[in-house]
């Protein structure tokens, strides 16, 4: 309530940190996407690249995917100092890991007839991939990149919590000082930024899917604008600051990661790794389930296929507002309502899940075949039974994969919610890193890697069953 009305006089002080946030997200997304495009074919199982390279790449991707952008940013500050360079480095790694996995999975599922024909003509594997596989998967690849850009804006907005630049430091400061009118202004600017990026992403996605067309001159201007935006964001980044980078600290860091604290790793106490990881999984699981239950009906209210346009516009706006707020901010807000602990973490991830799941469910509804539903309506069947018998059977596999993906995301987000007192493994990990207790940090990171790997295996089996 104290955020309304926002302090509009504070906008001028927000613009530069907001630019840094956009700068990190744009540069990190483009660089991470580029590296993923170049290296992802080496991870595909059906293209004949050496198995050793494929295994090494997949192990690296698995390790990087185990950590949220905030943890990657905190690690980067020890290497490159404080500032936007560390934040951009973290967003690049985060994007690279996700995009590489998605792309080599798409390549593995693609039709390889054109690829095999080119190989039979003596074309090298990589060139055959470019001409035989890439044209098939590039629309999905670019769509995933646009979705990650929107996600990375929210990630970049909290990297200031660990000194990696952007609007996060300002946001944390104003929340700590209880200046909620200024917090409202910051969140309003983030919301407007997310709205602009989402509209632009939808426009580009429609061009990619050939649902819209533009003239050649307009296409050239669009490419020129995108190139200029990337160059401006890249060449105005802060340079890495190695003046505070201690070689001894780096040696201790890597030694701690290679020789973790095994007593903490195997501890069965309440403050041991096993209990904290279990708490993290429970927070992520319950938050995902609550989010999925709420999101399913909201998705039907969010699309013009099932409700009038004004109703869908209203719900679209509400969901966009929910998605524009960084998850750590929700954690800080709910702590003041329910106090610190795992329950706050569940509330936080439930609300964040509603934002993402409703968006993805709506996209699935917009893409389904509506003819069975309209046929049942024409026969006099009421809308709810018609949805149950014609829509839900089509959506079950898609909804399942979306929910599993969100659970995977929630595991990583739950792993840093402890930073604001919302339970899980986050607080011990960040405190260990800030206190240079690298053996304990190494044990926690190893636990996260194994946890995410196990969840990936379970998710793959569930997905295969669907």
Please state what every model-predicted region is.
Residues 1-26, 30, 34, 46, ...:
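N-terminal, non-cleaved signal-anchor transmembrane helix
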Residues 15-23, 57-64, 150, 172, ...:
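Alpha-helical membrane-interface segments at transmembrane helix boundaries
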Residues 25, 29-41, 45, 70, ...:
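Hydrophobic positions within alpha-helical transmembrane segments of bacterial inner-membrane proteins
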Residues 38-73, 102, 297-331:
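Cytoplasmic-entry segments and transmembrane alpha-helices of multi-pass inner-membrane transporters
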Residues 61-95, 319-350:
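Generic hydrophobic transmembrane alpha-helix motif, especially the helices
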Residues 78, 152-190, 336, 412-448, ...:
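Glycine-rich helix-loop "coupling/hinge" segments at transmembrane-helix boundaries
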Residues 82-148, 155, 199, 340-391, ...:
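Membrane-cytosol interface at the C-terminal ends of specific transmembrane alpha-helices
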Residues 143, 181-237, 442-466:
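C-terminal transmembrane helix and the adjacent membrane-cytosol boundary/short C-terminal tail
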């Amino acid at each position: 309530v104290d955020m309304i009305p926002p302090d509009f006089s504070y906008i001028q002080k927000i613009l530069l940190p907001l630019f840094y946030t956009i700068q990190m997200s744009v540069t990190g997304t483009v660089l991470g996407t580029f590296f993923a495009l170049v290296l992802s074919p080496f991870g595909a199982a059906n293209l004949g690249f050496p198995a050793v390279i494929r295994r090494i790449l997949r192990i690296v991707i698995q390790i990087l995917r185990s950590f949220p952008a905030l943890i990657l940013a905190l690690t980067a500050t020890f290497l490159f100092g404080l500032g936007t360079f560390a934040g951009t480095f973290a967003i690049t790694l985060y994007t690279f890991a996700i995009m590489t996995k998605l792309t080599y999975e798409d390549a593995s599922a693609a039709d390889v007839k054109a690829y095999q024909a080119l190989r039979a003509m003596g074309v090298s594997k990589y060139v055959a991939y470019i001409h035989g596989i890439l044209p098939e998967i590039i629309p999905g690849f670019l769509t995933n990149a646009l979705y990650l850009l929107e996600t990375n804006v929210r990630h970049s907005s909290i990297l200031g919590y660990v000194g990696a630049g952007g609007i996060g430091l300002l946001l944390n400061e104003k929340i700590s000082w209880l200046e909620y009118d200024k917090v409202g202004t910051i969140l309003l600017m983030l919301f407007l930024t997310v709205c602009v990026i989402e509209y632009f992403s939808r426009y580009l996605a429609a061009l990619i899917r050939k649902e819209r067309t533009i003239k050649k001159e307009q296409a050239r201007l669009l490419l020129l604008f995108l190139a200029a935006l990337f160059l401006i964001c890249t060449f105005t980044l802060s340079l890495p600051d190695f003046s505070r980078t201690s070689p001894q600290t780096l040696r201790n860091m890597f030694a701690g990661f290679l020789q973790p604290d095994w007593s903490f790793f195997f501890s069965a106490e309440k403050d041991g790794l096993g209990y904290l990881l279990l708490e993290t999984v429970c927070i992520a699981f319950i938050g995902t389930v609550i989010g999925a239950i709420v999101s399913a009906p909201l998705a039907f209210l969010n699309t013009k296929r099932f409700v009038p346009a004004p109703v869908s516009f209203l719900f679209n706006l509400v969901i966009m507002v929910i998605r524009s707020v960084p998850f750590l901010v929700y954690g800080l807000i709910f702590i003041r309502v329910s106090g610190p602990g795992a329950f706050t973490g569940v509330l936080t991830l439930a609300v964040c899940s509603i934002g993402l799941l409703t968006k993805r469910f709506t996209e699935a509804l917009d893409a389904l075949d509506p003819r069975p539903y309209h046929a049942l309506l024409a026969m006099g069947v009421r809308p709810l039974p018609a949805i149950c018998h014609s829509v839900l059977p089509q959506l079950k596999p898609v909804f399942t994969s979306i929910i599993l993906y969100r659970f995977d995301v929630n595991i990583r987000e739950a792993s840093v919610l402890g930073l604001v007192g919302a339970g899980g493994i986050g607080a011990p990990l960040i405190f260990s890193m800030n206190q240079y207790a690298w053996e304990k940090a190494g044990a926690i990171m190893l636990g996260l890697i194994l946890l995410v790997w196990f969840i990936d295996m379970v998710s793959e089996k569930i997905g295969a069953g669907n």
